[in-house]
């Protein structure tokens, strides 16, 4: 099998101050994904088996666009790709970047607070879900969600830095295709309560694997891969 390292870097532009721009955590995801693409599979899953892919908290759209660009290189990789975000500005930015990368209207972008506004038709559909979540503990100034500004949604993970992730884990069971191989990729931080996060993961019936990490200043940024094991 031939590993592909020539997938184009998505062209990303965004003029909105409230939108999270691609950073080290974004590229931690992309670097891992590049290493796991072969001539006929992604991270051990055959291309033909991947029918639905979700980029949760899409931001500028960089992850969703990356996978849509992969389709242009490997037609057998042809899932329906979705990108969602809580901020309307993110969707505007992501759609502009889709056009910038010459893949207009191929990705379905829509506004949702996690899975809250997802249609019933997407239940039990997704083989691959990627979430680069807000993963840092709340600032004392924005303990209440009513005090959040737009950009705060990109980093504020709750009081312990894990509340958003735990809510995500509880909701996503309804949208994973449990009849096929499925993976959920997410980012976590050593500055959050990782011990409690892991306990919640196990209690909810998932198995988690740390795939990679990078150290930045006083923090480890960790790439994780999750699957549901308790039916």
Where are the regions a protein language model picked out?
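Auxiliary N-terminal substrate/complex-recognition segments of SAM-dependent methyltransferases
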Residues: 1-231
């Amino acid at each position: 099998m031939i590993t592909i390292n020539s997938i184009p870097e998505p062209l990303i532009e965004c003029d909105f101050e409230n939108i999270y721009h691609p950073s080290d955590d974004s590229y931690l995801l992309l670097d891992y994904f590049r290493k796991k693409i072969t001539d006929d599979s992604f991270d051990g899953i055959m291309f033909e088996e991947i029918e639905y892919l979700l980029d949760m908290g899409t931001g500028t759209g960089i992850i969703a666009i990356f996978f849509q660009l992969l389709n242009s290189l490997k037609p057998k990789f042809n899932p329906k790709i979705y990108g969602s975000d809580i901020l309307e500005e993110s969707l505007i930015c992501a759609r502009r970047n889709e056009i910038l990368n010459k893949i207009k209207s191929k990705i379905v972008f829509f506004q949702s607070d996690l899975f809250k506004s997802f249609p019933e038709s997407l239940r039990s559909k997704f083989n691959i879900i990627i979430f680069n979540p807000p993963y840092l503990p709340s600032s004392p100034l924005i303990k209440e969600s009513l005090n959040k500004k737009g950009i705060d949604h990109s980093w504020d993970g709750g009081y312990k830095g894990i509340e958003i992730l735990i809510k995500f884990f509880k909701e996503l069971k309804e949208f994973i295709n449990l009849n096929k191989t499925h993976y959920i990729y997410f980012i976590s931080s050593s500055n959050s309560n990782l011990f409690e996060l892991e306990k919640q993961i196990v209690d909810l019936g998932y198995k988690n694997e740390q795939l990679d990490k990078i150290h930045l200043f006083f923090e480890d940024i960790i790439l994780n891969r999750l699957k549901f094991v308790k039916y």
